[in-house]
Amino acid sequence: MRASVLPDKPGNYIIVLRSTSSLPIKVQISTTPILTSFDYKKEKYNVVYVGKSSKSLRIRDYKQHFTGTAGNSTIRKSLGCLLGFKLIPRDINSPQNGKTTFGEFDERTLTEWMKDNLLLFYYANNDYANVEKELIRIYNPPLNLQGNFNKTNLDFRKELSALRSCTSAKQAPIPNNQLKLNTYPQQLQCSN
């Protein structure tokens, strides 16, 4: 993924699994999410997260999500928790504020996992708030915890929220446990 192909404009983005990838589930979680997909160039992509950027798709999407830290990216925090990474206080001088991130090694591991397993589609527009609501309604991405009112994946989102609210990994990792595997796609562009 190259940041230079993303516009320095507001808009929306959809984060999908590469066709050969699945969500990483390395912790005990009882619900398997149902993934919705869309077709792009004769390939199906499972949607895991959608979002909006009010200023710059380049900065929000690439710099915060794909090269940032979990302290500033909800998708990074969700994926890291699913990978079983231990949450630590983000602000050393203010650990009681409840803001968390992962250690340096885990953040690097997460960045590599994301670059290897995810793709980002984007749609530059100025109606990003309404478009985001519609994308969440249409695709029901399991990692969108706010604004997702779909009953499908509700139990998964509750379990993921509980994982994210813990300040330490309370559940033992499960080795090699991975999940098995439409109106906006015409306007979306892939950043890969």
Task: Identify the role of each PLM range.
Residues 1-192:
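Boundary/linker segments flanking structured domains
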